[in-house]
Amino acid sequence: MAEDRTGQTAVLFISARTGEDAEGYATAAAAMDALAAEQPGYRGIDHVGNADGQAITISYWADEASAIAWRKHPEHAETREAGRGRWYGWYMLHVATIGRSYSWERK
């Protein structure tokens, strides 16, 4: 079950992939997931996608400063540029502070 994320900063990355270089994309995505998890303030990630290459990835950070530091990380910036050049047809990003967080689970 999900943790309470009230007060955390959420970065919502909504994208559509080109379908180009799927292996390179998978390698880069795994590397970025691992690198993000090592960053100060990282709190977790959720990801959903469909067969058409559209996806939503939400990364959670302790605060906006942590999210900004991740955006500025040199390896992340390099991979972001590769994504613009090869892997994404488009993307949009939203940053928000979570005002309320709860979950439910069937038992």
Go through each PLM region and give its residues.
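Short S/T/G/P-rich N-terminal loop/turn motif that feeds into the first structured element of a domain
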Residues: M1-A55, E64-K72, Y88-K107
